[in-house]
Every structure is written in structure tokens, then in C-alpha cells.
From Swiss-Prot:
Protein name per Swiss-Prot or TrEMBL: Nucleoid-associated protein Cphy_0047
Keywords: Cytoplasm, DNA-binding
Subcellular location: Cytoplasm, Nucleoid
Coiled-coil intervals, chain numbering: none
Species of the source: Lachnoclostridium phytofermentans (strain ATCC 700394 / DSM 18823 / ISDg)
Length: 119
């Protein structure tokens, strides 16, 4: 029975082999960049600096700092809003930098296989 499709001897042609090597290099670069980003921290403030929140690249809140002036037992809701605002801004900064870093690695793909917009 004749063998259909494939390549004689099971070898990939040169271009396919190069593409696979390039994909493996890119995967390694993305893994390295992901690890690097996980070790970084981003900080954001709200209320004119009254609340400062620091988040990690693992999307974890590392610290929350409050100035004495913002702690008002009669207005807990404002303090809660400021903490949420600072946290969201710190996470937005982290996501933006992370996406930019991944795009710099995967940017050469264009929209190859629909993957271009993933990062």
C-alpha cells in the first residue's frame, strides 16, 4: 500500500524546521518574560496620594498604604472607593506593561493563525 501525504523519511522541509525552531525560541522568550514580569511590582495612588497600592506581576496586592488624613470613621465608603481605584490603576499598569512586553516578542507573528491579538 502506497504511503500518502507526509514527507519522505518523515523529515520536515527546511522552512518548516526553521519555523519550529523560531516558535520554540519565541516560547522560551515568552516564558522568560512572564517570569520577569511576575517578579516586578507596580504602584498607583488615589486621592492625591492618600492611598497607595502596590501589586505584583502575579496580580496580587503586595501593600496598601493609607495617609492618616484619609482615615475617617464617618466616611469609610470614601476610603473603600480610594482603595479600589488605586488597586485597579495598579493592575491596569501591570496589564499594560505585560501586554506590551508580550507584543514585542510575538509582534513578528502579525495575525499568524489568529494568534496576533492574544498578547
Amino acid at each position: 500500500m502506497a504511503k500518502r501525504g507526509g514527507f519522505p523519511g518523515g523529515n520536515m522541509p527546511g522552512n518548516m524546521n526553521n519555523l519550529m525552531k523560531q516558535a520554540q525560541r519565541m516560547q522560551k522568550q515568552m516564558e522568560d518574560k512572564t517570569k520577569e514580569m511576575e517578579e516586578k511590582q507596580w504602584e498607583a495612588t488615589a486621592g492625591g496620594g492618600a492611598v497607595t497600592v502596590t501589586v505584583s506581576g502575579k496580580k496580587e496586592v503586595v501593600s496598601v498604604k493609607l495617609s492618616k488624613e484619609v482615615v475617617d470613621p464617618d466616611d469609610i465608603e470614601m476610603l473603600e472607593d480610594l482603595i479600589v481605584a488605586a488597586t485597579n490603576e495598579a493592575l491596569r499598569k501591570m496589564e499594560e506593561e505585560s501586554a506590551s512586553a508580550m507584543n514585542s516578542i510575538a509582534g513578528g507573528l502579525g495575525n499568524f493563525g489568529g494568534l496576533g491579538g492574544l498578547f
